[in-house]
Design a protein with these regions (language model features):
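Bacterial N-terminal signal peptides that target proteins for export
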Residues: 1-12
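Bacterial N-terminal signal peptides
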Residues: 10-21
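Histidine-rich, glycine-flanked metal-binding segment
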Residues: 28-29, 43, 47-87
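Divalent metal-coordination and catalytic microenvironments
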Residues: 41, 56, 61, 83, ...
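C-terminal cap of metal-dependent C-N hydrolases
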Residues: 41, 390-432
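Metal-associated gating/positioning segment near the N- to mid-region
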Residues: 81-153, 161
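His/Asp/Glu-enriched, well-ordered alpha-helical/loop segment
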Residues: 101-103, 109-114, 257, 296-299, ...
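Polyanionic/metal-chelating signatures
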Residues: 131-286, 409, 415, 426, ...
Length: 487
């Protein structure tokens, strides 16, 4: 049995360890958007070049001024960024952070009824860690277990605020599709259970087509009802709601974006054909590792591509992946972003983007767009974020080196003009936490020593025990004796 006091101290220490970011939550409360002037920085605006020794004035959470010389207002908090670089906040177009529990509702092939926004977890430590990597916005997706998965949500990484404050206000909602090995469950089965349809790529296509045929008919039923009501027909009876089809109708109406997990060229072209058949647009192809083979078709469809920088050969679908994928699609006119699909990968998306300069020869500006403006365009939020322009949200990252350098380390991350990560404060809090841990350990040590000394007259451990061998001790009448000498 565990010593209760030791267990208590262990819990305290463990809690302190995992609570470290609690000390480094937003420096400014949500209702106190400060006036901040960042000055003497190299500003990489993404949209209109680089400003050397530049300044950014932030008011009410927005970028108020950007230029070479801005006078600080009297009430401004001045950040001297001499020798440092400022870029727009990094946007991860494929993320699974901040989710409470599994990201997959894999019991059915079409799970459009479920919504990731309902299970956001504001205490997920990956929010803080990704802030430390410069990420300010994430497209949080359902998993890829279904041909048509759950509804998605775009969030801002407002660490320290409740779940209701995470969603990006005004962002177009999305829905996750998946093609290939994952939805047909090539490497997954439940013992004793009937395999779930579909089990082939053909089945995946027909699952999507059938769902949209139903959604189209469902939409027509509602359109007819609305026309009758508008014409004054009081006998019109409202159709029955279908929560599974409602999100698909929103796709048909352009009110919800499709983000499709895919790898191979054949399935990419298949989905583009189905989308054309039903009159909707695929907003982004996610992963899209063979996108370079059909880049012209992707560009012609007006579809974006969100891919990895250099992940390949980790499963059969990724066999033909190449690190030149992002650059080739960019050259062919596709709006491309680099995503993480992994909480740790998201902490260095700036360096993932930099790899495209080596593999494909993208320029510095083109590479930086892959994790800033381009994903903003893909998510339909480029009027608010993605570049450093007057009027946009003050979502900014300050680096100690060029952000595409392997030596770049985030110094501060701002969202809506508030500092949500500060490296100096983080380091100071680590030192304070270490002191607290040592103090608790010392307190426990003294308590144990005091307990060992005992009170005057107390018997020490082992005192007062019966003498003699076990076999000499009294035993109940008629009890059998068993010698354990040979055991």
């Amino acid at each position: 049995m565990l010593n209760k006091k030791k267990m208590h101290v262990s819990i305290v220490l463990t809690t302190c360890f995992f609570a470290l970011p609690l000390f480094t939550r937003a420096a400014n409360p949500p209702d106190a958007a400060p006036v901040i002037l960042i000055q003497n920085a190299t500003i990489l605006t993404v949209s209109h070049g680089t400003i050397e020794h530049g300044s950014i004035l932030i008011k009410d959470g927005k970028i108020a001024e950007v230029g070479a010389s801005i006078k600080a207002p009297k009430d401004a908090q001045v950040v001297d960024a001499a020798g440092q670089f400022v870029i727009p906040g990094i946007i991860d177009c494929h993320s699974h952070i901040a989710v409470d529990g599994s990201v997959n509702e894999g019991s059915v092939s079409v799970s459009s009824i479920v919504n990731i926004a309902d299970v956001l977890n504001p205490d997920d430590i990956d929010i803080y860690r990704d802030l430390a990597g410069g990420v300010t916005v994430a497209n949080v997706l359902h998993g890829s277990a279904n041909s048509i998965g759950g509804q998605t949500v775009v969030i801002k990484l407002r660490w320290g605020l409740p779940a209701s404050r995470l969603p990006f206000e005004g962002a177009v909602p999305g829905i996750k599709f998946a093609l290939g090995e994952n939805p047909k469950r090539s490497n997954f089965s439940i013992p004793g259970a009937t395999p779930r349809y579909p089990a082939t790529r053909m089945g995946v296509e027909e699952t999507i087509r059938t769902a949209f045929a139903e959604a189209r008919d469902y939409k027509k039923t509602w359109d007819d009802f609305d026309k009758r009501v508008a014409a004054g027909d009081k006998s019109a009876i409202s159709p029955r709601r279908d929560l599974r089809l409602d999100p698909l109708v929103e796709v048909l109406e352009g009110k919800r974006y499709v983000h499709a997990h895919c790898y191979r060229e054949d399935e990419i072209l298949m989905l583009l054909r189905v989308a054309k058949e039903f009159g909707f647009k695929v907003r982004t192809l996610q992963h899209v590792l063979e996108g370079y083979k059909v880049a012209d078709e992707i560009a012609a469809a007006g579809t974006g591509a969100s891919t990895f920088s250099d992940w390949w050969a980790y499963k059969v679908e990724a066999y033909d992946a190449i690190p030149y994928n992002a650059a080739i699609m960019t050259r062919r006119g596709v709006v491309v972003s680099i995503n993480s699909d992994d909480a740790e990968e998201a902490t260095h998306l700036n360096q993932e983007a930099a790899k495209t300069m080596k593999f494909g020869g993208l320029s510095h500006d083109e590479a930086l767009k892959l994790v800033t403006l381009n994903p903003a365009i893909q998510l339909g939020i480029d009027k608010r974020v993605g570049s450093i322009d007057v009027g946009k949200d003050a979502d900014l990252v300050i680096y100690n080196h060029d952000p595409l350098s392997a030596y770049a380390v985030v110094q501060q991350t701002l969202i809506d003009g508030r500092i949500y990560f500060d490296r100096r404060r983080d380091i100071a809090d680590r030192a304070n936490l270490e002191k607290e841990k040592k103090a608790l350990m010392e307190k426990e040590k003294k308590a144990e020593e005091k307990k060992g000394e005992g009170k005057p007259g107390d018997k020490k451990r082992g005192e007062g025990k019966p003498e003699g061998k076990p076999e000499d001790k009294p035993k109940p009448p008629q009890a059998a004796s068993v010698s354990g000498g040979a055991l």
